[in-house]
A protein has these predicted regions:
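ABC ATP-binding cassette signature C-motif
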Residues: 1-167
Length: 167
């Protein structure tokens, strides 16, 4: 379509820019999520090990398990291998990884696509506590209404900002 996902990928440095420049503010750390990015998960690790891998800040297992629990990974589920997870579970795990070591700019491309309603609601609650900037592309009206403070319509090469959510 209109280039919404491409814009997020450029901002997240996932794809190169063909012309122009990409400039972010000083000390901006970017986290990017799309349902296609679950391929970055290590399939041989446990859910808990994968969730906490590469986190620079020290995080306790209890805190990690708390966030995993909010995303419906409870009890022994945290010891499952990533390879046995469903597509939706892998998406939830990728989101957990972002939220355990949050960047200050979160780019989300259709983040609710493979999630069921309890997972979407858990994700919304986690994002409500997020203190950075969120830029997302979504067709999920429930998600948009819960998260958006400003809406931008991209259509026919034109960008139109609106104050408020979907309504």
């Amino acid at each position: 379509g209109a280039g919404k996902s491409t814009l997020l990928k450029i901002l997240g440095n996932i794809i190169p820019i063909e012309a122009g420049t990409r400039e972010l503010g000083l000390n901006v750390s970017v986290g990017y999520f799309s349902q296609q990015r679950v391929d970055v998960l290590d399939m041989e690790r446990s859910v808990l090990d994968e969730a906490t891998d590469g986190i620079e800040s020290s995080i306790t297992e209890q805190k990690a398990r708390g966030i995993l629990g909010a995303f419906l990974f409870r009890g022994d589920d945290v010891f499952k291998k990533v390879r046995v997870l469903s597509g939706g579970e892998k998406s939830r795990l990728a989101l957990v990884k972002l939220l355990l070591d949050p960047p200050n700019l979160l780019l989300l491309d259709e983040p609710t696509t493979h999630l069921d309603m309890p997972s979407i609601d858990a994700f919304i609650e986690a994002l409500k506590n997020y203190t950075g900037t969120i830029l997302f592309v979504s067709h999920d009206v429930h998600f948009i209404r819960a998260i958006a403070k400003t809406t931008i319509q991209i259509e026919a090469g034109k960008v139109t900002p609106y104050a408020g959510d979907y309504d």
